[in-house]
Amino acid sequence: METIVIIGAGASGLACMNELVKTNKYNIIVLEQSNKAARKILASGNGRCNVSNLNMDIKYYNHQDPLIEKLIKEFDVVNFFKQLSLKLRYEKNLVYPYSLSSLSVKKCFNEKYG
């Protein structure tokens, strides 16, 4: 089994780990410089952690990069968090953890992967 090393246990690193674990093909090691995984997740949205916006569109980005547009269209953030068993709530177009606490986002990764 090949080993993949992910540098950084922030939102992207944890999401990458989640997708790789699903394949069951790799031994995965996540390296984090600080003593806390998901440190910026905990600080995001004044501790509420807005996980997505239902009105995602390339026009809201500074660059009209085709890769970004493709990712916006193909990656379902809401479904991603539902698969991690994170309950969500909606306030207008914004998507938050139901608890309105960024700690819930971190916990959903911890509960699935330790």
What label would you give each PLM region?
Residues 2-30:
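N-terminal Rossmann-like FAD-binding beta1-loop-alpha1 element of flavoenzymes
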Residues 30-32, 90:
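General beta-strand structural signal in soluble alpha/beta enzymes
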Residues 34-65:
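Conserved N-terminal glycine-rich FAD pyrophosphate-binding loop of Rossmann-like flavoproteins
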Residues 60-62, 70-75:
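Glycine-rich phosphate/pyrophosphate-binding loop regions near the starts of catalytic domains
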Residues 63-68, 92-93:
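Short glycine/proline- and acidic residue-enriched helix-loop micro-motifs
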Residues 73-114:
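Feature captures the FAD/FMN-dependent oxidoreductase FAD-binding
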